[in-house]
């Protein structure tokens, strides 16, 4: 299935690229989420008419993500959790908890933007957590987990 990308998608292409994808990926993910449109003759013409508007929108999203990354670079978040004698948490600190703590400290962060490659945090200590704010913008924030 051939589609026109309406935004940059990792490992696939940039805004305006005409790419071939598997039919299920196109029909079930790209088209419903508005990330692509089918590459018919009329859709190609409609896309070319809106190209400048879409590029401007993409640039605004990237600039917004870069501004948030600059705010997050100097941010340090402390999360309090109940823990045992040896620093092992009762439960864990996940992406939702980190996103809530960052939002409470003044920078809006969605749960899906938080990356924990080693899984949830289960020990007291300091952690560098990666944030994926945009396809081109990554940020790192220091999360300190202390026992309650």
Swiss-Prot record:
UniProt cross-references to InterPro entries, sorted A to Z: Ribosomal_bL9, Ribosomal_bL9/RNase_H1_N, Ribosomal_bL9_bac/chp, Ribosomal_bL9_C, Ribosomal_bL9_C_sf, Ribosomal_bL9_N, Ribosomal_bL9_N_sf
Entry superkingdom: Bacteria
GO MF term list: rRNA binding; structural constituent of ribosome
Entry GO terms, CC: ribonucleoprotein complex; ribosome
Pfam families the record matches: Ribosomal_L9_C, Ribosomal_L9_N
UniProt keyword Ribosomal protein, yes or no: yes
Keyword Ribonucleoprotein carried by entry: yes
Gene3D superfamilies tied to this protein: Ribosomal protein L9, C-terminal domain, Ribosomal protein L9, N-terminal domain
GO biological process: translation
Keywords for this protein: Ribonucleoprotein, Ribosomal protein, RNA-binding, rRNA-binding
Family membership: Belongs to the bacterial ribosomal protein bL9 family.
Function: Binds to the 23S rRNA.
The name this protein goes by in its record: Large ribosomal subunit protein bL9
Source organism (scientific name): Ectopseudomonas mendocina (strain ymp)
